[in-house]
Amino acid sequence: MNTIKVRDIEIGAGAPKIIVPIVGVTKDDIIAEAKTFDSTPVDMVEWRVDWFENVFEFDKVEEVLKELRDALGNIPILMTFRTSKEGGEKAIEPEAYARLNVKAAQTGYVDFVDVEIFTGDEIVKKIIDGVHAAGARVIASNHDFFKTPAQSDIVYRLRKMQDMGADIPKIAVMPQNKRDVLTLLSATEEMVTDYADRPIITMSMAGTGVISRLCGEVFGSSMTFGAAKKASAPGQMGVNDLSTVLDLLHKAM
């Protein structure tokens, strides 16, 4: 499997890298939180732009991106508009979604954008090609907040993301029981062992699935999400506790 080097981190090598989300509503809240990350074990910051009150005014989005880049120094930025159909704050038309993501990449301030893989193949390809042309990378994603699909279906979705040209495929699913967590972990191992030529991100959500956020180095998930302030999904641990556990597991391997 190939690793991905972005700024000062290498994704896919060593312990899973920690992504910390920012879910502020106002520009002041967003930038204030970003300025607290000096003392936080964060490898990448995800700006959940769907929470931003002015998300549909691109000049204001660009202002925040510029100030985020200044505040975060060399920490990579992932910009994510999580749509309401996949658990996000707002709905958006596919063409507007494409424009937002490509224009964000063209600013030069973001390192990754998140693209929901089931937005429609034509739109997804347009975004991936546009983001790559701008010199940024893509995390393709899929979220099921209600269930855990069959192992074969999880692997199919991750392979589709890879085949579409995403730099990092990502899937998050909701367990109904402990066996569902095993299904997610088994799918992760299968994908990494048999199909993946790039890093992937997988997780089982909520308290039942929290182990999946910790054992990525064992099963093959290269990044994990931790909360510095407000969690953006069920089951996210505090970033300091998460970092401690990841370090302990890494030293034992």
What are these language model-derived features?
Residues 9-13, 70, 105-107, 162-163, ...:
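Solvent-exposed alpha-helices and their adjacent loops that cap or buttress functional pockets
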Residues 112, 117-253:
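Catalytic alpha/beta core domains of metabolic enzymes, predominantly
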Residues 6-9, 68, 96, 151-162:
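Short N-terminal signal/transit or membrane-insertion segments
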Residues 1-10, 251-253:
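Short, Lys/Arg-enriched, disordered terminal segments
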Residues 1-5, 60-61, 183-184, 206-207:
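Short amphipathic alpha-helical surface micro-motifs
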Residues 2-4, 13-133, 143-147:
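Active-site beta->alpha loop and helix N-cap motifs at the rims of alpha/beta catalytic domains
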